[in-house]
Amino acid sequence: MTRPIVNIHEVSLVPRPAEFAPEGPAAEHFALSSAQLARPLGAKKLGYGLCALPPGKAGYPFHSHRENEEMFLVLQGSGEVRIGAETYPIREGDLIACPPGGPETAHQIRNTGTAELRYLAVSTRLGPEICEYPDSGKFGVYAELAPGKDGKPGYFYFMGRPEQQLDYWAGEGGNPG
């Protein structure tokens, strides 16, 4: 059985893998080091992550989740959280709730302090998930797939904009059966 305890003071944070690192102008605004804790803990329906933001950076674009709920506990540092049309100052000890929904629940944490901002992120792990990005007009579809030959789960990911939508029948003029 997986040991159901992890001490967050003994966890190593790592930057995003190169394939998910922000590039170009986005690199000026986003940086995140994190440790994913759910699988090492053996969690099935909740996700846990320890996150660290350097001064002046956000970890993710302003986004909402249609299925999953998130909660953040600020462990150290200070910053701000933008939720919908409002922005709130945050500091050590603050607990932030981000329920599922549309643009009114979109959220983003930014480090506006002078030292590292650390927080624990907790979320439900429902799938598939649809995220919306109100600032850029994008949406993302995410789903975990069956494990591959290596035993690791597969992943489906699509990022787009509504105007890129295909007609349901596009490309279906061929063999009907």
What role is predicted for each listed range?
Residues 1-45, 132-177:
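A short, N-terminal "cap"/entry segment at the start of jelly-roll beta-barrel domains
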Residues 31-36, 49-65, 100:
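Conserved short histidine dyad/triad with adjacent acidic residue
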Residues 85-101:
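Short acidic-glycine-tyrosine-enriched beta hairpin
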Residues 100-129:
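Ligand-binding loop in jelly-roll beta-barrel domains
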